[in-house]
Amino acid sequence: MLHITEKEQTRGLRQLEKRGKRLLPPLIKFIWFCLISAACVAATTFYWLRLSPVHNIHKHSLNSSFEDKGEDGTLQLKHIFHHGVGEKDYKIHKRLDVTQEYLIKHSAYFQNMVNEQQQEVQEIQEIHKRHEKQEIQVKYGPDQEYNQTNTALNSVGTEYKSRLSTNEYDWPDVHRGKNPFDIQLPFKNKQSIARRIKHRNEPFFIESYLDYARSVNGDALILNRINLEWIDDDINIPNITDKDTIVTLATISSNAYVRFPQNDDDKKKSDWTDVGGGWIPDEENNDVNFGWEDVGLRGHIFVSKDNKTVVIGIKGTSGAGLPGGGSDETTKNDKTNDNLLFSCCCARVGYMWTTVCDCYEKAYTCNQDCLEKELRRKDRYYEAALDIYKNVTAIYPPETTDIWVTGHSLGGALASLLGRTYGLPTVAYEAPGEMLALKRLHLPQAPGLPRHLEHIWHIGNTADPIYMGVCNGASSSCSLGGYAMETACHTGYQCVYDVVTDYGWRVNLLNHRIHTVIDDIILVYNETAPCVYQAPCRDCFNWRFVSHDDKE
């Protein structure tokens, strides 16, 4: 029998201890290697899937945490204003009140709308599931099956994008299945100070100032002699660092595109109240339809439960030419006002173009007086926006109500101009540069206004060629559609989501859509975009604008 002494036993334990010390570090390294490898694989998979356009859309649109938050601190659609434009219809101005009786009257239409939206959601979810399945096969499938699977993936992606483009009710995916006419949208505000003209709401005061400013060609020395009285008002402004508030205002901008019910009674104007010049249907005009099918500008009015906050949502450009809305009924007048507001000279891009006014004189020379007169015509959208505001204030006194303005695309630019005119907080989405139009209109600007009192915010993304001011040139999508979008300079703050750098997006006109902004951008980012003041900027620098007073 082998006998081990205590001394030998101690020596053996020491040897085992030394051997353990030599073996332990490699074991720990192996364990750490496995953990790090697993983490890298998980992170890579998550990042790869996150970059997928389909994943981005449905991560927040079909399973979004953005929900209605009850009645407190919410906004709901209460009125729709329609203002006719054009030489024939610009005096027509009607208001539709979205009352409980109105909702009950058209309940069948709204229920059908909700049902069809829910069906669209289910169909898109099925496409999304097939897309995710193909994604996994592409990433982890055998090499010999890669080309076949990738082709299938592209096919599913094409089907998905095609399905999204048939959004019949022009409604964001995050709100699919909800009635646009009774949805309650949460918002947050914060206190601030607004410096604005004291007598701005007196009848014809603003119009008289603008007419005089145009008559003196905006001469600052002459205008300063008027000594406009500016005051600092304590107001509530939208909290633009709150994502729900940004989504709410974007939804209001989108809501202005939504179709609403029209039947024989609507065509007889039974639901509309005349707030204009007493227009009455007659034998020559009894076929005029208000709302979406008629030419003109529309404003959707959302009101808080306590009636202390009112938001005016101005409809933007309709039609396939500039995606944003889904229908073509108002495309002609939208295009005219787009080309008037955002081109250097009446959309005189080339000799083949049809201009929207007669201000062009010769090569890169334009009549400034003519341009300013065209913008102030009563049948243009800017004047229509002023009338909508005045009719809103007839219901909700501006002395006791916080009035905000929002809009998308053309609607966003008009919202900014309206906000500048009356000193209203404004949040514009993907609006073309409106600084040139502001100068041509000679809108009043508070002297020595600190930047922290600037309440104009432009929400945009770097993949939108219209917002970035690059949708021009002979081969651009805008030019091919007949739009002369030549401006890039905005006023106020710019809050830009850099989707090109962050997600590898390419500049594409489809990224101008308000639905893309809501579903694929704002809701995807964890925080709202940082806002910076507009850097020095000048549009149409190669043009010469002459006045009748100029001596050549």
Curated annotation (Swiss-Prot):
The active site is at 409 (charge relay system). Residues 1-26 are cytoplasmic. Its EC number is 3.1.1.3. One of its GO terms (molecular function) is phospholipase activity. Glycans are attached at residues 63, 147, 239, 307, 391, 526. Pfam families: Lipase_3 (PF01764). Lipase which is essential for lysis of subvacuolar cytoplasm to vacuole targeted bodies and intravacuolar autophagic bodies. Involved in the lysis of intravacuolar multivesicular body (MVB) vesicles. The intravacuolar membrane disintegration by ATG15 is critical to life span extension. This is Putative lipase ATG15. The gene is ATG15.
